[in-house]
Amino acid sequence: MNTPDDSSVSSVDSHQPYMGFDDNVEKRIRELARSLTQQSLTSSNRSVNKEAPADGSAPLDRVSTRASSIFSADFKGVNPVFSDEEEDDYDARLDPNSDEFSSKAWVQNMAKITTGDPEFYKPYSIGCCWKDLSASGESADVSYQSTFLNLPVKLLNAVWRKARPARESDTFRILKPMDGLLKPGELLVVLGRPGSGCTTLLKSISSTTHGFQISKDSVISYNGLTPNEIKKHYRGEVVYNAEADIHLPHLTVYQTLVTVARLKTPQNRVKGVTREDFANHVTDVAMATYGLSHTRDTKVGNDLVRGVSGGERKRVSIAEVWICGSKFQCWDNATRGLDSATALEFVRALKTQAHIAKNVATVAIYQCSQDAYNLFNKVSVLYEGYQIYFGDAQHAKVYFQKMGYFCPKRQTIPDFLTSITSPAERRINKEYLDKGIKVPQTPLDMVEYWHNSEEYKQLREEIDETLAHQSEDDKEEIKEAHIAKQSKRARPSSPYVVSYMMQVKYILIRNFWRIKNSASVTLFQVFGNSAMAFILGSMFYKIQKGSSADTFYFRGAAMFFAILFNAFSSLLEIFSLYEARPITEKHRTYSLYHPSADAFASVISEIPPKIVTAILFNIIFYFLVNFRRDAGRFFFYFLINVIAVFAMSHLFRCVGSLTKTLQEAMVPASMLLLALSMYTGFAIPRTKMLGWSKWIWYINPLAYLFESLMVNEFHDRRFPCNTYIPRGGAYNDVTGTERVCASVGARPGNDYVLGDDFLKESYDYENKHKWRGFGVGMAYVIFFFFVYLILCEFNEGAKQKGEMLVFPHSVVKRMKKEGKIRDKTKMHTDKNDIENNSESITSNATNEKNMLQDTYDENADSESITSGSRGGSPQVGLSKSEAIFHWQNLCYDVPIKTEVRRILNNVDGWVKPGTLTALMGASGAGKTTLLDCLAERTTMGVITGDVMVNGRPRDTSFSRSIGYCQQQDLHLKTATVRESLRFSAYLRQPSSVSIEEKNEYVEAVIKILEMETYADAVVGVPGEGLNVEQRKRLTIGVELAAKPKLLVFLDEPTSGLDSQTAWATCQLMKKLANHGQAILCTIHQPSAMLMQEFDRLLFLQKGGQTVYFGDLGKGCKTMIKYFEDHGAHKCPPDANPAEWMLEVVGAAPGSHANQDYHEVWRNSEQFKQVKQELEQMEKELSQKELDNDEDANKEFATSLWYQFQLVCVRLFQQYWRTPDYLWSKYILTIFNQLFIGFTFFKADHTLQGLQNQMLSIFMYTVIFNPLLQQYLPTFVQQRDLYEARERPSRTFSWKAFILAQIVVEVPWNIVAGTLAYCIYYYSVGFYANASQAHQLHERGALFWLFSIAFYVYVGSLGLFVISFNEVAETAAHIGSLMFTMALSFCGVMATPDAMPRFWIFMYRVSPLTYLIDALLSTGVANVDIRCSNTELVTFTPPQGLTCGQYMTPYLNVAGTGYLTDPSATDECHFCQFSYTNDFLATVSSKYYRRWRNYGIFICFIVFDYVAGIFLYWLARVPKTNGKIAKNGKTAKVNFIRRLIPF
């Protein structure tokens, strides 16, 4: 295992100045290294000396104190796993649970162990060289935004592109030919602007090329191994770590890391150590190394699940890769979200790995400090996909200076190198201009210069030499090392360390942890299904009290319910598949496990909850329904249903693994659900199926299982007959063949019906097929299981697309038209000017930066710099703040489990107009929490203290009077930049301001943020929309467009940006401050230059405790002086003050403060001055007159009606621009209704035809679940954006939000209902019934109204279940159970007369009761019935009587039925019904109630909407509780979210 450097091997010595390595120290270390033998591990420490930056930024005490002992220690290779303090060889530096633990010592000790027995441990290394490397991606076929109308055209174009011969325009070049060489032990930093190809380069050299292609001419070699060999055999040795932190949120940090450790534990580990002990030890070392030990039992979390902080989550990602022990690592912006000191320690860690373990690391860093840069051996500079330099990191500056560029004195080397790629940023040396020397400026010019340079020739020679000297021995060394690490049963050619079954074992443990940590979902499913068993079983309870032939239909219906409920209980598993897929993809690239092993383990881990659910449901249901009381029959019933559960589970998993998104999966899943349920054999017996569709029955596993269940229940049973034809009155004494049982399968003269006869005549089922169902079911279980494993193993994720802006189609047309005109008028335009115009970096900010770099010196006046900045900015009428915002004794407590934790501890401060205040601290110190508390954005916990505006408590308009730029760039992805800004301006600026003025202000914001080139671009998603920088600008722009009059909060505005964009962003903030705006900004990685742009600093340490609040001073001298006066070691002149300060207070990883600087602050004179200033503010400012303007004190700037209008317009626009949701809804509707319609095509007027029409209506409603599952994620996306950004800023009211959701969804559902009506109504043949009854128009119109109402009802119930739920999956569970209950009690499966009296109320409150009653009566009423031959009952009339004479009394009483031949004397053929209304009466359906039912159903829809609105208010709208402190002032505004416990 490799480990990073523990940057603080010893605590900071306050008596030693922070001066770095001086000449004497370097001399002593060199002498010490020479004195040791070659075998000593201190040979690697000579390279550590080279690691020391030339500017002396490494702390001296790390060398002169305990570090010196590490450098000189001759480790004996102590087994670190069983370190015991009682043992003589115990070394605290090797114990991860000790405060004295040193990761560097641990690595050196492990290196000593491995080098001591090379035959066992097989040490090896991997380098890489690439030659003429170029990459290309598929040109996106979506150059314009997709909408509901243009999506089909785009899809047809895409099909045409696939069908026609390939063209050069089908691909675009991401990387142009480039070269590089990395030897073992080297570090490479890749510098370039966003979009320059940094990520693609890292993916290319790490052989992670899914989504783009490497050209055939490219050469990539890893010690002689090709990329294909790496992918196939050594995937885990070459790793790419993406920027995003993707983890299973419900796992703890320990569980996440120990799983990786188990899967990467080598066979040739430390001798005498078990696999489990080694994995646990390595996990402890990783957590200690990266400062995660305190989060051991904390969930990793994500945006929805509370867990560790963002910085800690990033460290978990880093620890994962470290545990993997990869020899070649590629890190994509791995320092994002880390403070500057932690980022530096991360690079130092990589340096230690490189020197001691001979690892290779390539890092793309957007904001690279000089200290971090000094640790790299090589640098690659990319410019729009071209490589313009590769070579020695320290020589790069000289190279570009020779090219003709000037590096200002204060500019760091990485900033200088990145600035070369920005025409607005770079500066040409005046001497070159004066001499007329041409300086390369375009990418092509720079590439040409690079290819003609001596550095390039030398690089090519080294690459050629390396390729020439690569041999089979190098490959064999890697192969032997890889095999030595593999477990016993692992294939030697496999890239994985442990065997397949061990992978399954460890993932299984992980999955059980997941289930345990999120047990609420599983428990809800188990107990929810058990409750449904009680409900459904009791519904059939009265029916099954007897075992007469009258119960045949209901007994079959109960069995049908049983198998469907068991089979489709796994449908929602599709949700969880998409949650875990990104993690599986990541772990596949780390070679942790086969994706199929993860699938295998997921199936096994779901067995216990499935079995428990099946046991509870089936026991309850079986005995309540009163199925056969026979042990053998019960266990067979249970076995068949369990097979149904797993067969369908595996089938739905196959569907999920084939599709890329949940909405894509819902269409085939719903079609399968419909087909499987309709062709089970109950709704339509196989003998009655249409010829074209009968094949579906033969491939339907549920059909065979249902047959087995029915045979199991009916075989070898006699069912007494209670109902005869004829019966009653004089017929009571009739016996023999003169009457017949009114049941299918009855025989004249018998007073019973054999179950086998019933099955044969009704379904063509036979007892000999009983075990056939079991065999077929098991075959399907096994088949779908292996298909699922194969799909998971070989189905890759979605391909990436190159970064591109997307515009609406109308804008693209306009741009093309303008482009043709521009091409004609600007044919001779200088290309450099065009390039300058295309850049999005703020030129004003660049000029200010250059001026600052040139003019800064000890005597420079910071005010002159500021005035220069002010003079360079355009006057756009930005709002100016006049109020002072201040807070005192601010505390924030949150309940965590059984205790209350204090997050903020008596924080004081203020923000004045025209000042730029920085808020800093280590990860988890409470910076974002402080901003949330100040901005009234907390949703839980208790806030105490005073938060004032001009000495008075915040009023109701406070939230909309501030701007809050969140760290996450949250925007509506379908809107354009200009639309986003206007939406903010329209709703957050006062209504008294005209639309024209608001539009002008928006244009001014676009201009000051330099967003003109993409003002009409769609926000989109990363890769297809705005890039990181553009999103950050839009985030700031949205808040500026609101024209905040008090202050602006910015949370990590520079996170993820390159140094130039970070500088431009900082200058923008400075510009706003110069316009009188008050700004409070959190910042993680400020460079020395960025730091000095701030006026004041509020610094927090762990626990939310203040360490410093005050002026920074010129060059941060005021802040530095404060810490130095209070015991801190001296800050070197060239050090970054931010990094120095983090180390002083112990906020940097591994550093330790020499005292509690919070207590130092509380006892300082500066603290007293702050308190005095706050008291003075409170007294003086409170005397100012209040703003009596009515608009100033409103919670929202505009009226509710105006908000509602704008939100509706935006939401309708979003639906129109989200064609995948709408087309999924409509395609699902069309295919479902076509399937139902043609399955029951033109149903006739026989009894079976009537039953088919009734069951078709029943199936018509089954589309509910898929429609619901499509809608819920769409609503959640809207809600997340509103609750995260728009509600806290008081953009618009929750009432406008929820009402708009209702109003905009309804029209699309009306369209869906109309489509369903047109297809279903006419294909089933209801129109023929209406025509025969001479009611064609009325009944057709009414059926259409009901069809629309049903689709609207789906949306209303969806809103109801998601209104109080956080997660769509839970809401889908609740919605599915509610729908199942409504469908069960609607009167189709069990008539109200047959239900227990207790459940009659459910029949009456089920909305589907009224829907199906009305649809059925409207569809089939007032039509004559004509029975088929098989439906006629046959009996013999008494001697001497005709059939008519014999049946006349019966017909007069019954009022329904007819004889086919009343004059017959030998056999009477009788049909039980003569009129459809008589059939409707048996299911309690009445035609005259149709309009009443419509009104009641509409009331259900209204109720769902009203209840949904109420529950949303109750569960998710913050309630304000003003608490009064002892001094009588308002202490807090506490937000409480009352969550419904689901």
UniProtKB/Swiss-Prot annotation:
Residues 1-14 have a biased composition (Low complexity). Induction: Azole exposure induced expression via regulation by the transcription factor PDR1 that stimulates gene expression via binding to elements called pleiotropic drug response elements (PDREs). Expression is up-regulated in azole-resistant isolates and in presence of fluconazole. Loss of mitochondrial functions leads to increased expression. Expression is temporary increased during the intermediate phase of biofilm development. Expression is down-regulated by the transcription factor STB5. Gene3D superfamilies: P-loop containing nucleotide triphosphate hydrolases. One of its GO terms (cellular component) is plasma membrane. The chain crosses the membrane at residues 518-540, 552-574, 603-625, 634-652, 662-684, 773-792, 1221-1241, 1256-1276, 1296-1316, 1342-1362, 1370-1390, 1495-1515. Phosphorylated by PKA. Dephosphorylated on glucose depletion and independently rephosphorylated during glucose exposure or under stress. Residues 153-409, 885-1128 form the ABC transporter domain. The keyword Transmembrane applies. Coiled coil: none annotated. This is Pleiotropic ABC efflux transporter of multiple drugs PDH1. The lineage of its organism: Eukaryota, Fungi, Dikarya, Ascomycota, Saccharomycotina. The gene is PDH1.
